[in-house]
Amino acid sequence: MSASPISPPRQDWARLVGESIKQHGVWHTYSKLLEARRAYPDDLSLRGYVEILRNNIVKELLAHPKGVNAVPKLSAEFLTNFDRFNLSAQEGYLISLIDGRMDISKLMILSPFDPFTTLFNLAKLQQERAITIPQ
């Protein structure tokens, strides 16, 4: 008698992601999907939803009235308590480029990262309140 391997239950990511976005917003859903990726590292549909959310986050950043011409500034909270922020190397590099005069399009040119990664990291810094993008 051979035992067939029991596959783990398949998640309904479409429903879970949709409900989470409605109830908690994009950033909370993104962090929960990152946690789920650690639990289900081989789930390709989960990876797809992570990328869809990353795209939505960048779209929200670019929906700013000034778009890529907006000038990010370091927040007062970051300047007074910067060690509270657990920045990645990419985020730290982008922070070092922000001088309050350079717009996002110039940051994308100066950044060694691809434009999407640069925009996503700027959106993440804005979400964490390390930078502000005035209207």
For the regions a protein language model found, what residue spans apply to each?
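Short alpha-helical segments that sit at the start of domains
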Residues: 63-92
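Long, charge-rich, low-complexity alpha-helical segments
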Residues: 1-60, 83-135
